[in-house]
């Protein structure tokens, strides 16, 4: 298993600890600002805003991610939630030896969004040696909660 090149560049940048959460987010978005290129997240338009060990924030357009009724598809909300939790988990591991993978994801969709951007904010709820749990709030442009999710990531060994 190898890390995604954009993620690897962001995590292995010299003096990464000195970067602000906004600078880390920009690094995660890649040189073209398109998110982690070639991933589901980039295909559905996820753009990082804030990346730290305790919190990850990103935005995603409703346009292109709708269900047949014209509202944001619940699967797109879940993809946003897992993307945020996974990136946050990567911030808490040794990227030369470990990776984080989502193993459990659940959400309650409380309101539909039909236009604009939604913003997801993942907050680290528990960090252990082999597991991390994140709570994710997804809100519409008016700041109203649309989905509340919880994502659990396992920490696995990579490399030799």
Residues of each region from the PLM?
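Terminal targeting signals and extreme-terminal segments of soluble enzymes
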Residues: 1-160
């Amino acid at each position: 298993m190898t890390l995604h090149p954009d993620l690897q560049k962001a995590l292995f940048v010299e003096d990464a600890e000195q970067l602000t959460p906004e600078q880390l987010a920009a690094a995660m978005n890649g040189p073209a600002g398109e998110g982690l290129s070639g991933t589901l997240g980039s295909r559905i338009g996820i753009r990082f805003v804030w990346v730290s060990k305790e919190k990850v924030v990103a935005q995603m357009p409703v346009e292109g991610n709708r269900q047949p009724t014209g509202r944001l598809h619940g699967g797109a909300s879940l993809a946003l939630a897992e993307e945020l939790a996974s990136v946050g988990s990567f911030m808490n591991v040794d990227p030369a030896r470990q990776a984080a993978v989502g193993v459990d994801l659940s959400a309650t969709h409380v309101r539909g969004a039909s236009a604009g951007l939604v913003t997801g904010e993942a907050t680290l709820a528990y960090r252990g040696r082999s597991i991390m749990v994140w709570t994710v709030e997804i809100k519409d442009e008016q700041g109203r909660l649309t989905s509340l999710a919880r994502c659990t990531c396992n920490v696995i060994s990579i490399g030799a």
